[in-house]
């Protein structure tokens, strides 16, 4: 158990680019000097959350735009929909993940492997041992930083805190058990096992699944303005598993531009049609972003230049040729025609 005084953490809108509402430079931290050692890890974790959000939603109608990445729920730019839920969860997970990893790497003097269960029986034929990643440490420190952003007691704050916790649960729930065999001539009579962090991509994929299954919480208008209202909010969220994402509002129509909400719509977005490595979701992106939004798919030819036929020359240089290649790209463009297939439904991001 790590008991610490709360830290004040503020996320502010970038002065130079107001649309870039959340970047690692937006973290302004004050508090005990002891916390300063964690600041670079917190910033790196926040950055990993940004990158993972953009990866997971690259071919969705909502593609994790910068304006969506402001963690403060009172800045006027944020809704309480399922996309907001994902942003909170993935950012919380990113901070916890990075703190845990850096702890195991020995970056902090007061933290190392979690050996609290070493020597104990873990299951049939194996014992706890080795160097487990210290998720308890990462969880405690990240909670002090990320949850400090929520100072309100209304439904929005409760939603954000719930999704922060869901992000931390995702890190713990995707940890991998790694084992080493012991015995004569590799007989593996017994095994010593420890827990390791997965690739952060696995955490992101797990939370993307939770995003699709997010639960909408219906509360009475104005709940939270009284002690009874705050109690009702607490009871409602307490009844929902902290492994699930929750939201209060339906999502807007991401096909359309909405300047008030900072949404650009899908016109002009690139989509994918061909490629050996494309998954089903990527291959359907032109239909999802263009056709179902009432837009045509415009084919554009372009020439790319890249290094190729690289050779190592003794000693010590690598020389490459410049190869030109014609490629075809696809974009959503305005067209006077009805949507292809079934009409899109407002609020859907798929």
UniProtKB/Swiss-Prot annotation:
GO cellular component terms attached to this protein's record: extracellular region
Membrane-spanning ranges: none
Heme recorded as keyword: no
UniProt keywords, alphabetically: Developmental protein, Disulfide bond, Extracellular matrix, Glycoprotein, Lipoprotein, Secreted, Signal, Wnt signaling pathway
Residues covalently joined to lipid (O-palmitoleoyl serine): 185
GO biological process, one term: animal organ morphogenesis
PANTHER family the record matches: PROTEIN WNT-8B, WNT RELATED
Designated name of the protein: Protein Wnt-8b
Organism annotation: Mus musculus
